[in-house]
């Protein structure tokens, strides 16, 4: 019985129904599997390889058709496959199902995945269940092919009351569940699949990218047009900006480096070490520097930082006459008394920031003493912080690092350069340097502290000052190039270069200048230096006090302004109490020179800074030269001698500072818990600033930050290309300015709607009313009523023109009544002048139809104009007829003019897009319709001449080939199914656009290719089957007509 059913109901090879396609694919798979089992694969490896390739192709085909059947039968009951979102993009291929089936059979047969033995052992039972379930499904589907197959049916026609159909339904559900489970297990074993947490972290990274893009658009780093145009440069700019924003702007987001490493996204986990160091540097940048860095990351332009690195970021108070000297502004004019205009960085402001809090909380005598000591040191502090310090922030900085740090560094004394220290001293000094110079992390809004809060921590501050000031002698400050942290920005896992920090050549050059300047200062030591140590120590203590208190207690800007105003007078008074506004320039310069006796670890540009000041301060030039140029000793001090001198001087300075602290303030006990937490805050803030102190200038810092950030972001393009593409695609779609207009899928209900109108030579306007290259658009023409589709009518060109005009009027919702006399006249003239006059009069009719439409359907004017111009056209056509008859006679004696004309016409019509569908059959038909009317008055030669005239006219009107714009593509989201076979698209069945109609089709329905010269596409491109049939058929018909026309003309 089964044999009979198989013989009777066997699907034919051309049957396109799902069951028939499955039947033939399954038979092909069975044949290949049988051939594989028939020989030893080890004996014939080449044949075995070919058969295995065919086997996998057939498995793909069988599973693809099975998937379509399950999609139709199960529908929403299919097992969900949301886990595919976690798969890499490279895994989701069309042949994934075949790979899974092949892997399941291998595992079921006892094989194991390479280096995945444990996972293979776990998956083996599941693989056996999958292969067994799939075999059962194949048997049931083959049975359904022989029972319920309907030839060429697009849907399944199963008998749901039959037990075999119910059994097939349940078997498909079981197979679908097992296959989905095996897919997840197998792919997870083969490639790394994200966990739930990692997938959520990737989504947070996408949110960070989107927020970064919106911020960049807001501040003007990027343009909305770049986002709308999907600028490829944004693929590099957005990840770079996201790193900066994630580390600084959104510090608690997915790039929070304080979270454990295993909680960080796997995209940035390999770069955690370098990201922490980048974050520490970014936190010390001002707003202007951060903007310059972000702009550099977007445009790759050169860094242009005109503001010096040590330029103050604190705004000076309102200018007052003779209040300060300007040591930073080169354009200032110095008077004889040394007074100058107040600039952004003034010694008055620097001193005020150091002692205003001290003046608020201590007695009047202590306040005056502190102010005096600070004023005595202010010029040196200013010169270090403003012009020569390579580690402070530029002017707009919200977190200035110049004043406190440079003050405490400038107020310390030392005798030897840091290159002479031992390794242990280097380590200790670096920690002390961190504690001292982290003061620059403080925000300018927190310059003053609350008076009530000061007493709580004052005693502990005094205890901490001793250690900080004692460490200042050996602290290298801003002045040491990077000597120990050679891999400051070098991650352990990211293959970036080592040249991110200062090189040894730069370090050696800095040490040479420091040693030369140190030799000069050592010879300048005077007994008065001991007297200056106490003010130096006091200034350092005050600076450190303000630093520690700012870290502990916040204050408002209003308090800062009040304190500034109340302490301004006490700050600028002299120790004599005489009420002089400030010391003269010579007095200040003496203090400046005394400071240089003790502070040798200053920047190597400091010497040049004094020369620069000398040019603008004539009153101070003599003393400045005296203190710096009277030394003529060229010898070099040995390292051991400098080391001993450094140690001895450090011990003596420590003892003096201890006595000064004990005498001036005294030490008291403080709260241990508060002290420890306070110390942690100080050390943390100071560690953050230490990294910035290693760079010579702002340009150097920004350049190396750019190299590090760009290196990390660009490695994401390589290591996590798939994830980054998905994130960027989502970001672009979210941040587009406006979504595209919805484009509905056109429903092809009528065969005529599949054709586009293309004007023939009869449709060309040849009068002055319009260009001779103009044609009617598709909106103005009804193809069903046009003579392009009217092949069998023999009423002449005038009737076709009338129909076409009427169709155009219907399209435009206008009513155009043309007088019958005009068209009767037209037909009579056609009968008297041949087919050439028929074509031309039809053109005239079209011309006037268009003109009447534009002028408001003026019937009478149209009829009168038609009759007039038809008379003129008749005379011209008669002259042309005589000329063509003469050319025909020349052709009979060997002239090649008509043949060349015919050949040019043929070539031009073949290449012209506007005559693709208006083949020569219609022109010959028009000629044959007009020929009987002139049979009694013309000879056969005249008829041939008329045909040649028509060909010449066609050649004239089609010489200029116009390229049409390609059709708009339907978006992928608007086409869930193939527009031809209605098969739904899946992750394995991808969409393809037809270049001719713009529709969306599957790979089967759009597997043809053909050139489209009408769109300027001379090479073969993808087109759907319908367009291929239509285009190829029309082109072949046209070519055949053009080839037969010269033969007919020569035969006649």
From Swiss-Prot:
Positions with biased composition (Polar residues): 554-574, 652-661, 926-935
Positions that bind Zn(2+) 1: 978, 981, 1002, 1005
Biased composition (Low complexity): 312-346, 379-392, 400-419, 824-842, 872-915, 936-963
Positions annotated as zinc finger (FYVE-type): 972-1032
Protein known as: Lateral signaling target protein 2 homolog
Summary of the function given for this chain in its UniProt record: Negative regulator of epidermal growth factor receptor (EGFR) signaling.
GO MF annotation list: zinc ion binding
Homology family: Belongs to the lst-2 family.
Native source species: Drosophila virilis (Fruit fly)
Keywords in alphabetical order: Metal-binding, Phosphoprotein, Zinc, Zinc-finger
Annotated Basic residues bias: 588-614, 625-644
Residues annotated to bind Zn(2+) 2: 994, 997, 1024, 1027
Family matches, as InterPro entries: FYVE_LST2, LST-2, Znf_FYVE, Znf_FYVE-rel, Znf_FYVE_PHD, Znf_RING/FYVE/PHD
Top-rank taxon, per record: Eukaryota
């Amino acid at each position: 019985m089964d044999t009979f059913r198989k013989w009777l109901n066997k699907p034919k090879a051309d049957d396109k129904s799902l069951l028939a396609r499955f039947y033939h694919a399954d038979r092909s798979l069975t044949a290949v599997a049988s051939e594989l089992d028939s020989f030893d694969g080890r004996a014939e490896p080449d044949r075995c390889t070919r058969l295995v390739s065919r086997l996998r192709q057939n498995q793909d085909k069988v599973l693809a058709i099975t998937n379509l059947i399950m999609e139709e039968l199960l529908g929403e009951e299919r097992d969900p496959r949301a886990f595919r979102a976690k798969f890499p993009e490279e895994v989701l291929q069309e042949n994934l199902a075949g790979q899974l089936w092949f892997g399941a059979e291998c595992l079921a047969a006892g094989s194991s995945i390479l280096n995945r033995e444990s996972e293979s052992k776990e998956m083996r039972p599941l693989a056996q269940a999958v292969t067994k379930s799939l075999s059962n499904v194949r048997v049931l589907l083959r049975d359904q092919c022989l029972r319920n197959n309907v030839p060429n049916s697009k849907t399944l026609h199963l008998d749901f009351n039959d037990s075999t159909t119910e059994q097939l339904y349940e078997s498909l559900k079981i197979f679908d569940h097992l296959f989905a489970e095996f897919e997840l297990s197998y792919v997870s074993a083969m490639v790394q699949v994200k966990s739930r947490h990692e997938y959520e972290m990737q989504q947070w990274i996408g949110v960070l990218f989107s927020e970064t893009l919106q911020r960049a658009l807001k501040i003007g780093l990027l343009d909305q047009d770049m986002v709308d145009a999907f600028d490829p440069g944004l693929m590099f700019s957005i990840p770079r900006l996201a790193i900066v924003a994630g580390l600084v702007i959104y510090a608690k987001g997915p790039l929070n480096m304080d979270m454990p490493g295993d909680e960080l996204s796997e995209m940035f986990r390999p770069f955690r070490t370098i990201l922490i160091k980048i974050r520490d540097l970014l936190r010390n940048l001002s707003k202007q520097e951060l903007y310059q860095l972000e702009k550099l990351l977007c445009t790759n332009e050169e860094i242009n930082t005109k503001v010096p690195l040590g330029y103050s970021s604190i705004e000076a108070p309102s200018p007052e006459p003779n209040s300060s000297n300007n040591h930073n502004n080169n354009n200032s004019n110095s008077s004889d008394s040394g007074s100058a205009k107040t600039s952004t960085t003034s010694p008055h402001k620097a001193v005020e920031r150091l002692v205003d809090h001290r003046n608020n909380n201590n007695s009047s005598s202590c306040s005056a003493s502190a102010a005096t000591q600070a004023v005595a040191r202010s010029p040196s502090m200013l010169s270090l912080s403003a012009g020569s310090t390579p580690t402070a922030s530029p002017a707009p900085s919200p977190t200035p690092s110049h004043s406190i740090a440079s003050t405490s560094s400038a107020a310390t004394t030392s005798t030897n350069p840091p290159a002479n220290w031992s390794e242990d001293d280097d380590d200790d000094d670096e920690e002390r340097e961190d504690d001292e110079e982290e003061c620059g992390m403080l925000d300018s809004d927190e310059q003053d502290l609350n008076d009530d809060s000061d007493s709580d921590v004052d005693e502990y501050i005094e205890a901490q000052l001793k250690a900080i000031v004692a460490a200042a002698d050996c602290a290298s400050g801003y002045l040491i190039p990077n000597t120990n942290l050679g891999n400051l920005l070098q991650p352990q896992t990211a293959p970036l270069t080592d040249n991110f920090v200062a090189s040894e050549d730069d370090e050696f050059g800095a040490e040479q200048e420091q040693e030369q300047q140190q030799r000069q200062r050592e010879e300048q030591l005077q007994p008065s230096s001991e007297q200056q140590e106490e003010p130096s120590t006091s200034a350092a203590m005050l600076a450190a006090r303000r630093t520690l208190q700012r870290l502990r207690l916040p204050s408002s800007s209003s308090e800062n302004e009040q304190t500034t105003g109340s302490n301004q007078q006490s700050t600028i008074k002299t120790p004599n109490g005489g009420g002089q506004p400030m010391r003269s320039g010579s007095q200040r310069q003496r203090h400046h020179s005394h400071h240089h006796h003790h502070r040798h670890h200053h920047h190597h540009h400091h010497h040049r800074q004094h020369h620069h000041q000398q040019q603008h301060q004539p009153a101070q030039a003599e003393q400045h030269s005296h203190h710096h140029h009277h030394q003529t000793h060229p010898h070099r001090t040995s390292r051991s001698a400098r080391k001993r001198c450094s140690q001895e001087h450090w011990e003596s300075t420590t003892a003096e500072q201890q006595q000064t602290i004990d005498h001036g303030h005294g030490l008291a006990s403080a709260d241990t818990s508060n002290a420890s937490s306070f110390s942690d805050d100080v050390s943390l803030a100071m560690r953050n600033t230490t990294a910035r102190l290693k760079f010579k200038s702002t340009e150097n810092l920004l350049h190396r930050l750019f190299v590090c950030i760009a290196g990390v972001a660009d490695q994401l393009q390589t290591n996590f290309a798939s994830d980054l593409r998905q994130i960027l695609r989502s970001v672009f779609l979210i941040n587009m300015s406006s979504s595209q207009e919805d484009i509905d899928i056109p429903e092809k209900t009528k065969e005529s709607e599949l054709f586009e109108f293309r004007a023939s030579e009869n449709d060309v306007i040849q009068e002055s009313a319009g260009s001779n290259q103009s044609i009617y658009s598709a909106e103005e023409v009804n193809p069903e009523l046009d003579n392009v589709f009217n092949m069998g009518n023999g009423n002449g060109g005038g009737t076709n023109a009338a129909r076409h005009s009427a169709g155009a009027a219907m399209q435009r919702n206008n009513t155009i009544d043309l007088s019958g006399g005009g068209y009767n006249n037209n037909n009579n003239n056609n009968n008297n002048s041949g087919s050439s006059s028929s074509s031309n009069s039809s053109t005239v009719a079209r011309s006037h139809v268009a003109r009447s439409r534009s002028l408001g359907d003026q019937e009478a004017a149209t009829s009168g104009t038609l009759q007039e111009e038809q008379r003129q056209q008749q005379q011209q056509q008669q002259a042309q007829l005589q000329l063509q008859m003469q050319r025909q006679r020349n052709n009979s004696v060997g002239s090649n003019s008509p043949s060349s004309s015919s050949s040019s016409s043929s070539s031009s019509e073949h290449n012209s897009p506007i005559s693709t569908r208006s083949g020569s059959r219609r022109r010959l038909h028009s000629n044959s319709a007009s020929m009987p009317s002139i049979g009694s008055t013309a000879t056969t030669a005249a008829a041939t001449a008329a045909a040649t005239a028509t060909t010449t006219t066609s050649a004239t009107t089609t010489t200029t080939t116009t390229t049409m714009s390609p059709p708009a593509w339907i978006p992928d989201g608007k086409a869930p199914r193939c527009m031809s076979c209605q098969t739904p698209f899946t992750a394995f069945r991808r969409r393809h656009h037809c270049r001719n109609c713009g529709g969306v089709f599957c790979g089967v329905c759009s597997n043809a290719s053909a050139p489209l010269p009408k769109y300027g596409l001379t090479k073969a491109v993808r087109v759907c089957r319908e367009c291929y049939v239509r285009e190829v058929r029309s082109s072949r018909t046209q070519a055949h007509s053009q080839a037969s026309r010269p033969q007919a003309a020569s035969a006649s």
